């Protein structure tokens, strides 16, 4: 906003908010990814105030900490004793320093998250245009019970603000209410504040009394009726908190759609206030976008995604995924059922597939982790493939250690990479290997476990079982019993403990797996290495 008159903003946030029934100050409760106070500060930002003060009282340390982190330019002002809104403004003015009589002071409640920048800008513009000593933001509602009424004279000028408990029968019929939002000229405001008394039932200094004092002094007082009365609604309990959250959600989703985002089902889509969406993005149902998440053009998110402070590149697809503080490259594919923990970076056209968890993992362009894997504290180069059920073993019980995987590497299925360890460019690991030592570039690392075949074991040790019947149907003839002199190499008879173990109704077949790599590429085999391929 451009104005020839400097603007100062005072936000009243000292109340306890007892109806919230919370140890957290009311103004720090969140909707749409921001605290109530943060929403008010954001709306007031359009005024380009030279100085902004927030009056704090209950939970002052928590509120001051929030301001230091999110709005360090704002001055927190402590109201030690709750002597009313007039007293709070007087304390804030003293902290803001000297103001010229013609400067504008805007006063806002800290619990009105639905106020918009447009409304505040219009309020101040009217205040300046009419050269008013005070301009009240009012609202016209059907049921004004409990609200202070704005009383006007025959010319429409404001004569007074009358609290509900003090209203006579005629005043009680007025539907125009005071929202608690004001624009004042600094000089008349300071003069009126000095004349406030606490001669009332509450023993407090009311800011509403300033209006009456200004009128009595012959100063012009105006009112601007807000276009949407809902904007001025305060949040006093958790029911109202949820209601305000619904309004903000609808606003944000509608704005996103009008800016070029397809939201398939607005009713099941939640987008925080600080999320940014480029045009031609698609948000599928049951998706939650939190924090400072950014989604680039052409990306598809959802269904059933929760992304927090996550960046998604152009044309990426993210399905049924949870991600926190992660980066997903352009054209990448993530999900379903993936969990990208903080520090995950997936490069361009990469893949993180089903039931994969990553943490502090930098995965290069076109690198793939298709399914059932844990990748933590790792750097992986480009075009590498991490086979199914691979685990980056990063924790020794005391400290975390890093694994480094080069480019064009094939990690076989069920590999355990025990950090710290490095696998060089173009290297392979065999399926089922435990890699504890560095693997040179282009090498194959295999941890052998010799396979032993005992012919006829099922027929002798599991007679009558489905497996034995299947073996017989396949033409397998059982050799003699264990201990038969013709079969001295057979296993010995079971011990008493072994014999006591019940024989299961069905035993799965023993897979004859190659000890050479399963790369996860989905190929039938790699030239010269039979059985080296595996599913992806």
Curated annotation (Swiss-Prot):
Nucleotidyltransferase among keywords: yes
Binding site for acetyl-CoA: 394-395, 413, 431
Domain of life, source organism: Bacteria
UniProt keywords, alphabetically: Acyltransferase, Cell shape, Cell wall biogenesis/degradation, Cytoplasm, Magnesium, Metal-binding, Multifunctional enzyme, Nucleotidyltransferase, Peptidoglycan synthesis, Repeat, Transferase
Record has 4Fe-4S as a keyword: no
Region entry N-acetyltransferase, spans: 260-536
Sequence segments annotated as region (Pyrophosphorylase): 1-238
InterPro entries noted in UniProt: Bifunctional_GlmU, GlmU-like, GlmU_C_LbH, Hexapep, NTP_transferase_dom, Nucleotide-diphossugar_trans, Trimer_LpxA-like_sf
PANTHER family, alphabetized: BIFUNCTIONAL PROTEIN GLMU, NUCLEOTIDYL TRANSFERASE
GO MF entries: glucosamine-1-phosphate N-acetyltransferase activity; magnesium ion binding; UDP-N-acetylglucosamine diphosphorylase activity
Disulphide-bridged cysteine pairs: none
Record-given protein name: Bifunctional protein GlmU
Positions with biased composition (Low complexity): 464-483
Sequence similarity: In the N-terminal section; belongs to the N-acetylglucosamine-1-phosphate uridyltransferase family.
First-listed, main subcellular location of the protein, grouped into a coarse class: cytoplasm
Species assigned in the record: Frankia casuarinae (strain DSM 45818 / CECT 9043 / HFP020203 / CcI3)
Function: Catalyzes the last two sequential reactions in the de novo biosynthetic pathway for UDP-N-acetylglucosamine (UDP-GlcNAc). The C-terminal domain catalyzes the transfer of acetyl group from acetyl coenzyme A to glucosamine-1-phosphate (GlcN-1-P) to produce N-acetylglucosamine-1-phosphate (GlcNAc-1-P), which is converted into UDP-GlcNAc by the transfer of uridine 5-monophosphate (from uridine 5-triphosphate), a reaction catalyzed by the N-terminal domain.
Pathway(s) annotated for this protein in UniProt: Nucleotide-sugar biosynthesis; UDP-N-acetyl-alpha-D-glucosamine biosynthesis; N-acetyl-alpha-D-glucosamine 1-phosphate from alpha-D-glucosamine 6-phosphate (route II): step 2/2; Nucleotide-sugar biosynthesis; UDP-N-acetyl-alpha-D-glucosamine biosynthesis; UDP-N-acetyl-alpha-D-glucosamine from N-acetyl-alpha-D-glucosamine 1-phosphate: step 1/1; Bacterial outer membrane biogenesis; LPS lipid A biosynthesis
NCBIfam families tied to this protein: glmU, PRK14352.1
Positions that bind Mg(2+): 111, 236
SUPFAM superfamilies: Nucleotide-diphospho-sugar transferases, Trimeric LpxA-like enzymes
Pfam families: Hexapep, NTP_transferase
Gene Ontology biological-process annotations: cell morphogenesis; cell wall organization; lipid A biosynthetic process; peptidoglycan biosynthetic process; regulation of cell shape; UDP-N-acetylglucosamine biosynthetic process
Subunit structure: Homotrimer.
